[in-house]
Amino acid sequence: MDAAFVIATIIKILIVLGLFSALAGFGTYVERKVLAFMQRRLGPMHVGPYGLLQVLADGIKLFTKEDFIPQGAVRPVFMIAPVITAATAFIAMAAIPMFPEFTIGGYTVKPIISDINVGLLFVLGVMAAGLYGPLLAGMSSGNKWALLGAARTAIQFLSYEVVTGLSVLAPVMIVGSISLVDFNNYQAGGMGNWLIWKQPLAFVLFLIAGYAETNRTPFDLLEHEAEVISGYATEYSGMRWGMFFIGEYANMFTIGFLVSLIFLGGFNDWGFIPGAIAILIKVFFFFFLFLWTRASWPHVRPDQLMWLCWKVLMPLAVINVVITGIVMSI
């Protein structure tokens, strides 16, 4: 392992940490503006031009708020839970190829921290491990609303992880690999080669499961204000609460990259649009879709969430895998 590789990897890690932490903060501004537009309001307007400095003001507020730990909390677990959420969100990005290769000063740069041949499995596995953050936070807070939020975390994440895995199984059978780079290369050659045309059902199933994995409306039962206050995060404040928040937004971008790489051609050129710009358009479209859904859809009840998972999405995912296997064997 040469020094150039180590230095390049460290730089990539720092870029991912800095960029997506900043995007998580800026994402709040975009979300508030999008929701305001859809509700015929203005949103943030007073801090800086068009409210652009609201993100900075919110960041200062989080950094300076008191780090309060409840008297009945299990202190070590309570303190480590937000770190688990943020860490798993960023670790999952290590195996995601975000842009095409490019050259700087004769050195070829691969915009991926770790190009492993089990990239898809790694990303899904690390994202699944992220459930321990909200789960431990709720169980260690000594608060009944937080405990209810933790219970919802367990049933929601564990159930929809199965749907996520089954939905990508059919595309994996077609590509013959679980490397995200191989998924991208398989779809080279234009829109006609995108996997969404061969696996439209898998695309829909994976996207719906992505909403549940990221705790976004209509599946935001973990911290539904009208039912469980702030759920698992009820007793958190300051930067510990901010870590949960950063993890959620980072996971939204991760899902956007996964959907783009698996089903929508990844970072291959999109007509006259270069690949790097093309994948950014796709990722930010899905980020906007998360916000659009929040403004348009009501919350679902926990029983409706489980009914949708086990009686609708799960059978459809299994049927899709069976049909794909039959078609490939003919």
Curated annotation (Swiss-Prot):
Protein name (database record): NADH-quinone oxidoreductase subunit H
Primary subcellular site in the record, as a coarse category: membrane
Keywords from the UniProt entry: Cell inner membrane, Cell membrane, Membrane, NAD, Quinone, Translocase, Transmembrane, Transmembrane helix, Ubiquinone
Residues annotated as transmembrane: 3-23, 76-96, 118-138, 161-181, 188-208, 244-264, 272-292, 307-327
EC number: 7.1.1.-
Enzyme class per UniProt: translocase
Family named by the database record: Belongs to the complex I subunit 1 family.
General function of this protein: NDH-1 shuttles electrons from NADH, via FMN and iron-sulfur (Fe-S) centers, to quinones in the respiratory chain. The immediate electron acceptor for the enzyme in this species is believed to be ubiquinone. Couples the redox reaction to proton translocation (for every two electrons transferred, four hydrogen ions are translocated across the cytoplasmic membrane), and thus conserves the redox energy in a proton gradient. This subunit may bind ubiquinone.
The species this protein was found in: Nitratiruptor sp. (strain SB155-2)
A single Gene Ontology CC term: plasma membrane
PANTHER family per UniProt: NADH DEHYDROGENASE SUBUNIT 1, NADH-UBIQUINONE OXIDOREDUCTASE CHAIN 1
